[in-house]
Amino acid sequence: MSESCPCCSGLQYNACCQPYLTHAATAAEPAILMRSRYTAYVKHDVDYLIATWHPDLHPEKWRESLTESCQNSQWLGLTILATSPGKIPDEGYVEFAARYISEIDSQRTEVMRERSRFLRQHNRWYYIDGVHLQTGRNEPCPCGSGKKYKKCCGQ
């Protein structure tokens, strides 16, 4: 039996992100690419992260940084908060929250919120960049607990 997919889709890994990480399939939309990239962080698959970053941005230069990030973070969960189209048909956005523990900075759970931009080129989606978003203390926690941020991951 296959393991649950780290992307928190509720599907088994072999029926969810594994085909993307093994290059047996390509993501049909930005949210799927986002989920597979999150899974690549969990699985320490730096080659996949580089392969899905737009080639014009020279992602190879980030290999060392990506490797360190994978090794020094324990990823706990992903929540897709919103998806939206871009200004052109081949552009899309995914807003997400990823929970993790940084083994360098602290041993407490952190939440990273980002609005990532994706671009489709030659029928393939690529990660372009992202804007980190701040969660207000009285806003709902992006981890999905139903609590206010200040009473949950923002402590």
UniProtKB/Swiss-Prot annotation:
Organism: Pectobacterium atrosepticum (strain SCRI 1043 / ATCC BAA-672)
Family the UniProt entry places it in: Belongs to the UPF0225 family.
Entries under NCBIfam families matching the protein: PRK01617.1, PRK01752.1
InterPro entries per the UniProt record, alphabetical: NTF2-like_dom_sf (IPR032710), SEC_C_motif (IPR004027), UPF0225 (IPR023006), YchJ-like_M (IPR048469)
HAMAP family reported in the protein's UniProt record: UPF0225
Name of protein: UPF0225 protein ECA2332
Record-linked Pfam families: SEC-C, YchJ_M-like
